[in-house]
Amino acid sequence: MQWEVVIGLETHTQLTTKTKIFSGSPTRFGAAPNTQTSPVDLALPGALPVMNRSAVERAIQFGLAIGATIAPYSVFARKNYFYPDLPKGYQISQMDLPIVQGGRVSFAMEVDGKTEIRSVQLTRAHLEEDAGKSLHEDYHGMTGIDLNRAGTPLLEIVTEPDMRSAAEAVAYAKALHTLVTWIGICDGNMQEGSFRCDANVSVRPVGQKEYGTRCEIKNLNSFRFMEDAINYEVRRQIELIEDGGRVVQATRLYDPDKKETREMRSKENAHDYRYFPDPDLPPLVVSAEWITRVQAEMPELPGAMRERFTREYGLSDYDAAVLTQSKAMANYFELICSIAGHEQAKPAANLLMGDVASAVNRDGIELDAAPVSAAQLAVLLHRIADGTISNKIAKEVFGAMWEAKSDSPTIADELIESKGLKQISDSGALEKIVDDVLAANTKSVEEFRAGKEQAINALMGQAMKASKGKANPAQLTELLKKKLSA
């Protein structure tokens, strides 16, 4: 039997407000336990919540970014459940009338070697408060409660069950991560829990309209874990059904060490939480004027920039998609092009996606902290374009520039000169190299003249080796062909 996978994601994004959603307590990460709390966060009698305007504005920004409907009137509700790190005995959230309704997130993904633009429909995005934290490992035989996180503002973003593979779910999650960090509503730090996903996974026979029984995998805080967890859960459900069993609706956790999911508890439905409107908070009213003001302050979005990069710079869909995965990368690319010229767009993209990205990842730094400026890279690109150095030598020069950490705008020229890396373009010098190589490699010469055209590659390699990589490849190839055909 052929199976179809059905996936929906719920993503909790921690909003970048300085204070909590219903109190004036700070939201800084890493403070000593229970030092960032207030009577509201601790649920002391008589303490009343007050809505954080900045949290609402960030929700409006997100709604505008995905083309959603911003509800002019939305309501907060109490989600009732007991947990030690939830002092009120309920979480303030939104149920029937969320602030953001509908919308769509588009993203690029590789399918069979081709770049496809796909999109996922969103059901809603609603504001809510985070719970505190239970600390199980810090105390022997006891659990500590840290309420610093209680009341931190969250925007929970819920998709329709539109995704059909773990790879597609990860591509969507990465695009969402890019979007919320791009517009500045979330810092996207998955290790600190600022961006965490729950995946609802089910399977059904191909062609069946009804959905299968879903299981929710909670708190996936890395894209790799998300893909592994979904793939495992899909295999588990299919094997269970094919062995005559049935999938039971449940909440599950992913164990990255064992690479498997395990049941945490039976899966609740909305009625289990007994939602009802919170009497301490008035309805949230968002005026058209407020939306217009927020819209005027919105930056160019990743999707629009991706399309502009293909149109304005002639980049492929793939290159444009990679460059717009991060606002820092996109801005860096445009700055290089503004200095080096649009004709250097493709070489600039290759340099950023290759050597620069590799160096940033190797050193574990952010692109903003890169020791090589856009102006310095523009000079390097010009030296490749004017034939001063080859692409191969450019890699060596870039590595030296990265290590030098120099402020000099002409560091590329200085390194090329001091290391003697200028490309050999003198016809006399190249001719001597070619003559020596042909004389020393008579077998390859005979093979080429006998019709084995790839034999020229061996000769080219020997010639480049003889020149210590400094020969102009185009001139060298032309000269080799001319001599071999004589």
UniProtKB/Swiss-Prot annotation:
An MF annotation (GO) of this entry: ATP binding
InterPro entries, per the entry: Asn/Gln-tRNA_amidoTrfase_suB/E, Asn/Gln-tRNA_Trfase_suB/E_cat, Asn/Gln_amidotransferase, Asn/Gln_tRNA_amidoTrase-B-like, GatB, GatB_C_1, GatB_Yqey_C_2, Gln-tRNA_amidoTrfase_suB_CS
Keyword list, A-Z: ATP-binding, Ligase, Nucleotide-binding, Protein biosynthesis
Domain of life: Bacteria
UniProt-listed Enzyme Commission number(s): 6.3.5.-
UniProt enzyme class: ligase
GO aspect biological process, one term: glutaminyl-tRNAGln biosynthesis via transamidation
Reactions performed catalytically: L-glutamyl-tRNA(Gln) + L-glutamine + ATP + H2O = L-glutaminyl-tRNA(Gln) + L-glutamate + ADP + phosphate + H(+); L-aspartyl-tRNA(Asn) + L-glutamine + ATP + H2O = L-asparaginyl-tRNA(Asn) + L-glutamate + ADP + phosphate + 2 H(+)
Function: Allows the formation of correctly charged Asn-tRNA(Asn) or Gln-tRNA(Gln) through the transamidation of misacylated Asp-tRNA(Asn) or Glu-tRNA(Gln) in organisms which lack either or both of asparaginyl-tRNA or glutaminyl-tRNA synthetases. The reaction takes place in the presence of glutamine and ATP through an activated phospho-Asp-tRNA(Asn) or phospho-Glu-tRNA(Gln).
HAMAP family in the cross-refs: GatB
Subunit structure: Heterotrimer of A, B and C subunits.
Similarity comment: Belongs to the GatB/GatE family. GatB subfamily.
Protein name as annotated: Aspartyl/glutamyl-tRNA(Asn/Gln) amidotransferase subunit B
Organism the protein comes from: Herminiimonas arsenicoxydans
